[in-house]
Protein backbone atom coordinates (compact mmCIF):
# COMPACT_ATOMS: atom_id res chain seq x y z
CA UNK A 1 0.00 0.00 0.00
CA UNK A 2 1.35 3.43 -0.96
CA UNK A 3 0.79 6.09 1.69
CA UNK A 4 0.14 9.67 0.61
CA UNK A 5 3.09 11.95 1.37
CA UNK A 6 5.39 9.04 2.22
CA UNK A 7 8.46 7.79 0.36
CA UNK A 8 9.57 4.31 1.43
CA UNK A 9 13.24 3.39 1.31
CA UNK A 10 15.02 0.13 2.03
CA UNK A 11 18.50 -0.01 3.51
CA UNK A 12 19.97 -3.45 2.93
CA UNK A 13 22.73 -3.77 5.52
CA UNK A 14 25.24 -6.47 6.36
CA UNK A 15 23.08 -7.26 9.42
CA UNK A 16 19.65 -7.19 7.74
CA UNK A 17 17.07 -4.90 6.17
CA UNK A 18 15.75 -1.60 7.51
CA UNK A 19 12.64 -0.11 5.89
CA UNK A 20 12.13 3.61 6.45
CA UNK A 21 9.14 5.84 5.68
CA UNK A 22 10.22 9.37 4.74
CA UNK A 23 7.78 12.23 5.34
CA UNK A 24 7.92 14.32 2.19
CA UNK A 25 5.09 16.58 3.37
CA UNK A 26 6.71 17.78 6.60
CA UNK A 27 10.33 17.45 5.43
CA UNK A 28 10.28 18.00 1.65
CA UNK A 29 13.82 19.41 1.29
CA UNK A 30 15.39 16.71 3.45
CA UNK A 31 13.43 13.90 1.81
CA UNK A 32 14.36 15.12 -1.68
CA UNK A 33 18.03 15.37 -0.66
CA UNK A 34 18.05 11.85 0.82
CA UNK A 35 16.33 10.40 -2.26
CA UNK A 36 18.86 12.10 -4.57
CA UNK A 37 21.71 10.48 -2.63
CA UNK A 38 19.94 7.10 -2.82
CA UNK A 39 19.26 7.37 -6.55
CA UNK A 40 22.90 8.28 -7.25
CA UNK A 41 24.09 5.15 -5.40
CA UNK A 42 25.94 7.30 -2.88
CA UNK A 43 24.95 5.25 0.18
CA UNK A 44 25.77 1.87 -1.38
CA UNK A 45 28.80 0.25 0.30
CA UNK A 46 29.04 2.92 3.01
CA UNK A 47 29.18 2.07 6.70
CA UNK A 48 27.51 2.95 9.95
CA UNK A 49 30.57 4.77 11.30
CA UNK A 50 29.16 5.97 14.64
CA UNK A 51 27.29 3.68 17.01
CA UNK A 52 26.44 4.90 20.49
CA UNK A 53 24.35 2.52 22.59
CA UNK A 54 21.13 4.11 23.89
CA UNK A 55 21.64 7.12 21.61
CA UNK A 56 22.05 6.77 17.81
CA UNK A 57 23.50 4.82 14.91
CA UNK A 58 24.94 7.11 12.24
CA UNK A 59 25.92 6.53 8.64
CA UNK A 60 25.93 8.04 5.20
CA UNK A 61 29.37 9.50 4.77
CA UNK A 62 32.20 7.00 5.18
CA UNK A 63 33.64 4.13 3.18
CA UNK A 64 34.62 0.86 4.87
CA UNK A 65 38.20 2.15 5.39
CA UNK A 66 36.72 5.20 7.21
CA UNK A 67 37.63 7.57 4.38
CA UNK A 68 35.01 10.24 3.70
CA UNK A 69 32.90 9.90 0.57
CA UNK A 70 32.92 12.89 -1.75
CA UNK A 71 29.50 14.55 -1.73
CA UNK A 72 28.03 16.04 -4.89
CA UNK A 73 25.18 18.00 -3.34
CA UNK A 74 25.26 21.24 -1.37
CA UNK A 75 24.20 21.31 2.31
CA UNK A 76 20.47 21.79 2.83
CA UNK A 77 18.18 24.04 4.85
CA UNK A 78 17.52 22.61 8.33
CA UNK A 79 13.88 21.50 8.58
CA UNK A 80 13.99 20.62 12.29
CA UNK A 81 11.16 23.08 12.91
CA UNK A 82 8.71 20.75 11.08
CA UNK A 83 7.13 19.28 14.24
CA UNK A 84 8.68 15.81 13.87
CA UNK A 85 10.54 14.66 16.99
CA UNK A 86 13.79 12.79 17.62
CA UNK A 87 12.11 9.75 19.13
CA UNK A 88 13.01 6.08 19.05
CA UNK A 89 13.07 4.82 15.47
CA UNK A 90 13.08 8.23 13.81
CA UNK A 91 15.67 9.13 11.17
CA UNK A 92 17.27 12.58 11.23
CA UNK A 93 20.03 14.44 9.45
CA UNK A 94 23.45 14.74 11.05
CA UNK A 95 25.21 18.07 10.70
CA UNK A 96 28.05 20.20 12.03
CA UNK A 97 27.58 23.00 14.58
CA UNK A 98 26.29 25.13 11.69
CA UNK A 99 22.49 24.55 11.69
CA UNK A 100 22.15 24.43 7.90
CA UNK A 101 25.09 22.12 7.15
CA UNK A 102 23.38 18.73 6.74
CA UNK A 103 24.30 16.91 3.55
CA UNK A 104 24.46 13.11 3.35
CA UNK A 105 24.97 11.82 6.89
CA UNK A 106 21.96 10.65 8.87
CA UNK A 107 21.22 8.91 12.13
CA UNK A 108 18.52 6.68 13.56
CA UNK A 109 17.49 7.39 17.14
CA UNK A 110 17.75 4.42 19.51
CA UNK A 111 15.67 6.15 22.17
CA UNK A 112 13.73 9.37 22.61
CA UNK A 113 16.43 12.04 22.19
CA UNK A 114 14.33 15.12 22.75
CA UNK A 115 17.41 17.27 23.47
CA UNK A 116 18.06 17.01 19.71
CA UNK A 117 14.70 18.62 18.85
CA UNK A 118 14.20 22.12 17.49
CA UNK A 119 13.56 24.72 20.21
CA UNK A 120 14.38 28.02 18.48
CA UNK A 121 15.90 29.42 15.31
CA UNK A 122 19.27 30.08 16.92
CA UNK A 123 22.53 28.18 16.43
CA UNK A 124 21.95 26.29 19.70
CA UNK A 125 18.23 25.77 19.27
CA UNK A 126 17.86 24.61 15.68
CA UNK A 127 18.09 20.92 16.50
CA UNK A 128 18.39 18.01 14.08
CA UNK A 129 15.83 17.55 11.30
CA UNK A 130 13.73 14.41 11.59
CA UNK A 131 12.41 13.35 8.20
CA UNK A 132 11.03 9.87 8.71
CA UNK A 133 10.82 6.73 10.81
CA UNK A 134 11.76 3.07 10.71
CA UNK A 135 8.68 1.08 9.69
CA UNK A 136 10.34 -2.37 9.65
CA UNK A 137 13.68 -3.63 10.87
CA UNK A 138 14.02 -1.92 14.24
CA UNK A 139 15.44 -5.27 15.41
CA UNK A 140 18.26 -4.76 12.89
CA UNK A 141 18.82 -1.21 14.17
CA UNK A 142 19.02 -2.61 17.72
CA UNK A 143 21.46 -5.30 16.57
CA UNK A 144 23.68 -2.60 15.05
CA UNK A 145 23.44 -0.65 18.32
CA UNK A 146 24.79 -3.62 20.29
CA UNK A 147 27.93 -4.03 18.20
CA UNK A 148 31.35 -3.62 19.79
CA UNK A 149 32.92 -0.23 19.07
CA UNK A 150 36.37 1.26 19.33
CA UNK A 151 38.48 4.23 18.36
CA UNK A 152 39.55 4.94 14.79
CA UNK A 153 41.33 8.29 15.21
CA UNK A 154 40.00 10.88 15.18
CA UNK A 155 36.67 9.01 15.44
CA UNK A 156 35.28 7.24 18.49
CA UNK A 157 32.33 4.85 18.69
CA UNK A 158 33.30 3.12 15.42
CA UNK A 159 32.13 -0.50 15.03
CA UNK A 160 35.10 -2.86 15.32
CA UNK A 161 33.59 -4.99 12.54
CA UNK A 162 32.30 -2.69 9.78
CA UNK A 163 28.53 -2.64 9.33
CA UNK A 164 27.80 -1.93 5.68
CA UNK A 165 24.88 -0.36 3.92
CA UNK A 166 25.10 -2.74 0.98
CA UNK A 167 22.33 -1.01 -0.97
CA UNK A 168 19.89 1.83 -0.45
CA UNK A 169 16.79 1.95 -2.65
CA UNK A 170 13.47 3.73 -2.97
CA UNK A 171 10.70 1.09 -2.93
CA UNK A 172 6.97 1.28 -3.60
Q: Where do the protein language model's features map onto the residues?
A:
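Cyclophilin-like peptidyl-prolyl cis-trans isomerases
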Residues: 1-172
